[in-house]
Amino acid sequence: MAKRQFSKMKVYSQVPADHIKKWEGIHPKEEDYDFVIDGNAKVYNSKNVPIAIVYRGIFTDEQLDASYPAFRLFRDDRNFWSDNRGQYSGQIERIHKVKKDGTISRQGRCKSIASGIAGYYESIGGRFKFPRETKYLQKYPEQWESLMPIFRVCGSWMQTAVKDRYDIQMDAVKKTSKDWVIPGTPFTTITVNNCVPAAYHQDNRDLKEGMGCMMVYRRGEYEGFELVVPEYRFAINMRHGDVLFFNPCIWHANMLPKNAVGEEAEDWERISVVMYFRKNLMKEPPKEEALQRVKKRESERYMGTND
């Protein structure tokens, strides 16, 4: 790996977390930050804990072009769009369907956005009482496999950027069934956003002691999407092929796009790929054991309906 020159900086907490909490679900404004990081940089807090490590232009155009079609599917296949991330995308209004009897459903949904997950997910109750592979792996296994080089490169750079955090995350990997880990990486899951600016949020289900990783695809003419970290009053401008390692448990959000030329996702496009370790997957049984539990539960349900 080529040696890089970094801007190193120490930042101090200036905005209390309970104050930022009030901004949850709201997009940031320019007055929320004092400066923008626009190159290789290492940012630490007053206790020398890494907040953000930016690597400019990690991937070649060839690597990005090869992986683009697989990531683009998260927009082109609307099965991967989400209508339950209203707060994440900053939506206030919810859409209420009209029932067959003509009444309005009380349960509202948000406008669907091109934001989807892939990889592995823990049991969360409701329809998902067991850990699972996401739909993307089942529907597009070849495309998923084509992304492995990207994930492994990011994992390798994580080891270089924040080795102590990488070691902690890999220790968590060892405590997790290999059925729920992206092979050869410190990650379990990815989120792919296509032209979706995130509102203020925290990723509290990620491994707090580890680090998240984000890479970005950019094309066309537009401005905005800077990643704002309000507690420390700075923002990061991610360019095409950049990689960012960051603490996902701190408050963060994207500026809204502006001055875009042409049609979204056709003439201009921004894809962010976030890789992370979902901490609750450490508690989950291997895939085969989980499947046996599903079969047992279905059998018990069937027997119950025939008593």
Where are these regions (language model features)?
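Conserved metal-binding segment of the jelly-roll/cupin
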Residues: 215, 236-251
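Conserved short secondary-structure elements within globular domains
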Residues: 189-198, 215, 222-226, 249-255
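Ordered, helix-dominated protein-protein interaction surfaces in large eukaryotic regulatory proteins
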Residues: 217, 229, 243-246, 256, ...
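Residue-level detector of short, conserved catalytic/binding motifs and their immediate flanks
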Residues: 211-213, 225, 242, 271
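Fe(II)/2-oxoglutarate oxygenase catalytic core
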Residues: 1-210, 236, 258-307
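A short beta-strand-loop-beta hairpin characteristic of the jelly-roll/cupin
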Residues: 217-239
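Short, conserved beta-strand element in jelly-roll/cupin
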Residues: 205-222
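Intrinsically disordered, low-complexity regions enriched in proline, serine, glycine
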Residues: 224-227, 238, 247, 255-256, ...
